[in-house]
């Protein structure tokens, strides 16, 4: 049984087809990169997996640990171990990071019939996890992401990931808006959280994040389909030759996809 | 109109009865003030929605009821255990308890006096020093309306708090007004007078609540004078029972370099009108008016504020928020006057409303009248629902849908509560708010 199995997934928003038959299998311990140009459907795929309600699945299925994922509410997916690192982390005035994370962690623990952590236990866990991502303690007591810099927001996502300890983490363009130092810190955090028991799906436009988070598999998403899969070297070829190279190589597929999209 | 005439006749009859019971006391300056108050009320009658200041708030149900002014103290079945839900634990401060508008010395708690501080019953203070009435109690000069006139007409008791020059009162003064009506609807009219001397500092907490489901009208007037360089925080928690009416008017005068903060929190009442009127009487003073109204069902909550920048170099900040559910209706009217001489005024007003249902509504109206040219005045109003992207973000971390909604609603509202500096009150308000926000709704029956 795979950790995640996406079968012939078709999805769209407001009647517009975006994903046109995605197939993807992720096993525990693996890192997968999903690369593609703007508008190819990368963030839609991440959103569908996390349960964004704006997206409508029209065909296909997604199995997570062998169970139907698409019937679950976003919070149920999170409690089952799925974590989406947002491309644009949301500011939540009036709710501190600490309060938010404690509520989230205890909701997850409760779902797993684990005892909820009290304030002291939670604080010691948080202190331990702060080291993973070199997270500034002063950000803990501030409202979630409010007034954070772009780098701080992305770091907060990975910090949350460290605390919530997901089985499947989906990083949606976590590299966007980061300078090279911040990128390295975020990537190192992700690497420290790797284990044989979890998996990471990295959604990105650029190859540079993959210098630091080295994927086992690279999938190229164009016009709603995975048109090519390979090892980490595929990312380097893409970096050199650009997405047009793939379009040229898999022209027939692209044409099909465009035709389907215009229906 | 007949109803209006009937209402006036009713209160005229009550006023005559009241005067007859006063005997010799009807010749005092205080009673002259009452007479002026009654004449003003009789001339105006209760307002109608034809009047601009009452356009969105109909007091017809209130004018149609013959309320009986409470003319003397009676314990009305209240005892010490009735105070517990309202008490601010751990403050160790003064607690002044009023039953249906009258001071209860038995239920109040006044720790041994400190120099420069006088607290207690306004009725007693006026008996001791009749000139007080002439010096301080004159709402008409500061834009009082028919309700303040009615309060003045039957003026008998309320809280009296005077803190002398340079004196700091560490613990808050808690003014607890409790009402209880049986079959007879009561008119409960406390009149509070708070005087902070030059450089004096204090916090006052007013709470209003009812016992039992009976119908009453609280028509409270609070007059506050902040001397030069003084600092007063005035927190008000309104939790009348859900069948009753509350009209509260707070009038504040600020001396030079004084600072005043009002935090007005509304949870209760069927029809509620709060007026907070602040007047700068000296330069370089600062006034902060905050408000939070949480309402549902058929509740109607109207907040009217006036900040009169009559002097130069003053600052005012205003933040009023509302969370409305069910068919609740909110009104916010924020007036800011900047007089011709009030150069370098800095005024900021914000009104934000969260609507949790399709039927809840808010009428919001900022009103800036600026006669000076070198000033900074801003205002803004937002009305909306919860941000679905925020809801999704919380859900994506494992927090349930309704918990996420309650959490975001709480965060929106507690922004105002966080501005209360009296710790015990702030904690109480947070707990009250938590109890009210459940299952994505506002719940008043707790």
What label would you give each PLM region?
Chain A
Residues 16-17, 76, 184:
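Short coil-to-beta microelement around the adenine-binding A-loop and adjacent beta1/P-loop entry
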Residues 61-77, 145:
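ABC ATPase NBD Q-loop/coupling interface
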Residues 90-167:
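ABC-family P-loop ATPase nucleotide-binding domains
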Residues 170-174, 181:
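Walker B catalytic motif
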């Amino acid at each position: 049984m795979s950790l995640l199995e996406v079968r012939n997934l078709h999805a769209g928003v407001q009647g517009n087809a975006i994903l046109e038959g995605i197939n993807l299998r992720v096993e525990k311990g693996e890192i997968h990169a999903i690369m593609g140009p703007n508008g190819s459907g990368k963030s839609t795929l991440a959103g569908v997996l996390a349960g964004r309600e704006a997206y409508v699945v029209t065909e296909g299925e997604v199995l997570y640990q062998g169970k139907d994922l698409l019937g679950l509410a976003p919070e149920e997916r999170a409690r089952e171990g799925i974590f989406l690192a947002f491309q644009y982390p949301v500011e939540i005035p009036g709710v501190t990071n600490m309060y938010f994370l404690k509520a989230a962690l205890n909701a997850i623990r409760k779902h797993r019939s684990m005892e909820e952590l009290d304030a002291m236990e939670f604080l010691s866990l948080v202190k331990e996890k702060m080291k993973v991502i070199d997270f500034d303690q002063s950000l803990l007591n501030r409202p979630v992401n409010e007034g954070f810099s772009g780098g701080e927001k992305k770091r907060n996502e990975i910090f949350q990931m460290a605390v919530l300890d997901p089985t499947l983490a989906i990083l949606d363009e976590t590299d966007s808006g980061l300078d090279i130092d911040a990128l390295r810190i975020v990537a190192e955090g992700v690497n420290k959280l790797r284990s044989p028991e979890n998996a990471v799906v990295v959604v990105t436009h650029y190859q540079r994040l993959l210098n630091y988070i080295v994927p086992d598999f690279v999938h190229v998403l164009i016009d709603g389909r995975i048109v090519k899969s390979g090892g980490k070297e595929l990312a380097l070829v893409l970096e050199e030759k650009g997405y047009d190279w793939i379009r040229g190589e898999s022209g027939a597929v692209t044409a099909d996809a465009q035709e389907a999209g215009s229906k | 109109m007949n109803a209006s005439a009937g209402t006036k006749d009713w209160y005229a009859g009550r006023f005559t009865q009241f005067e007859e019971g006063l005997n010799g006391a009807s010749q005092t300056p205080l009673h002259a003030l009452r007479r002026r108050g009654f004449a003003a009320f009789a001339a105006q009658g209760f307002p109608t929605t034809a009047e601009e200041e009452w356009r969105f708030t109909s007091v017809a149900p209130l004018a149609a009821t013959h309320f009986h002014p409470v003319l003397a103290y009676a314990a009305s079945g209240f005892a010490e255990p009735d105070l517990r839900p309202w008490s601010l634990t751990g403050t160790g401060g003064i607690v002044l308890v009023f039953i249906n508008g009258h001071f209860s010395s038995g239920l109040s708690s006044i720790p041994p006096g400190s120099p420069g501080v006088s607290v207690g019953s306004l009725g007693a203070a006026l008996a001791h020093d009749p000139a007080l009435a002439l010096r301080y109690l004159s709402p008409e000069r500061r834009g009082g309306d028919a309700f303040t006139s009615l309060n003045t007409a039957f003026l008998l008791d309320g809280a009296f708090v005077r803190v002398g020059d340079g004196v700091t009162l560490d613990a808050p003064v808690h003014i607890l007004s409790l009402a209880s009506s049986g079959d007879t609807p009561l008119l409960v009219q406390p009149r509070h007078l708070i005087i902070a001397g030059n450089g004096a500092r204090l916090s006052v907490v007013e709470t209003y609540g009812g016992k039992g489901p009976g119908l009453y009208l609280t028509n409270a007037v609070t007059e506050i004078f902040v001397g030069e360089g003084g600092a007063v925080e005035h927190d008000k928690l309104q939790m009348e029972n859900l069948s009753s009416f509350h009209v509260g008017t707070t009038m504040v005068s600020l001396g030079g370099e004084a600072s005043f903060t009002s935090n007005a929190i509304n949870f209760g009442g069927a029809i509620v009108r709060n007026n907070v009127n602040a007047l700068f009487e000296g330069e370089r003073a600062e006034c902060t008016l905050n408000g939070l109204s949480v309402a549902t069902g058929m509740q109607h909550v109207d907040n009217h504020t006036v900040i009169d920048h009559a002097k130069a170099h003053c600052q005012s900040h205003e933040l009023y928020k509302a969370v409305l559910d069910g068919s609740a209706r909110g009104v916010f009217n924020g007036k800011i006057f900047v007089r011709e001489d009030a150069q370098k005024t800095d005024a900021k007003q914000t009104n934000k409303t969260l609507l949790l249902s399709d039927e809840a509504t808010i009428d919001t109206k900022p009103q800036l009248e600026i006669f000076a040219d070198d000033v900074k005045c801003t205002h803004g109003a937002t009305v909306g629902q919860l941000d679905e992207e925020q809801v999704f973000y919380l859900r994506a971390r494992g927090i349930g849908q309704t918990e996420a909604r309650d959490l975001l609603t709480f965060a929106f509202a507690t922004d105002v509560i966080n501005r209360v500096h009296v710790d015990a009150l702030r904690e109480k308000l947070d707990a009250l708010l938590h109890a009210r926000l459940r299952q994505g709704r506002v719940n008043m029956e707790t």
